[in-house]
From Swiss-Prot:
Protein name per UniProt: Phosphopantetheine adenylyltransferase
Summary of the function given for this chain in its UniProt record: Reversibly transfers an adenylyl group from ATP to 4'-phosphopantetheine, yielding dephospho-CoA (dPCoA) and pyrophosphate.
Organism: Rhizobium etli (strain ATCC 51251 / DSM 11541 / JCM 21823 / NBRC 15573 / CFN 42)
Gene Ontology CC: one annotated term: cytoplasm
Marked site (Transition state stabilizer) residue numbers: 17
Domain of life: Bacteria
Amino acid sequence: MTTAFYPGSFDPITNGHVDVLVQALNVAEKVIVAIGIHPGKAPLFSFEERAELIRLSLAEALPGKSANITVVAFDNLVVDAARAHGATLLIRGLRDGTDLDYEMQMAGMNRTMAPDIQTIFLPAGTASRPITATLVRQIAAMGGDVSAFVPAAVLQALTSKRKA
């Protein structure tokens, strides 16, 4: 069974992330969504909240296939975490040339550290290219409508956070 590792902060998961996950299931039988835990960062959503939002979003977007996706946390090197979970593929989504430049650099470093793990680049669909979790958080914090950018569960969670 081919296992792919898709790391990110997913704070929150967006339609762009979901698009990449749908594509990832076309190249791997199992995908591990790995939420990076960084002590120096203060995320909007806790790990538990992000994990639940990912599960809810994928159950909606991938009925019957969400069982092929596991959500985990990691706080070490991506390649070490991927290897620990038995992954041989590292999934990276690309929105534009800027993403490609950065991701190519990271892929080179990762390949040097872990030649047994191959990086797969998956291009974002046209509708999800402009979406970033940072922009979603900023727009939502100012009361803007982010319904076109996030799954329904995330929209509800963002609305609840704003009212709190």
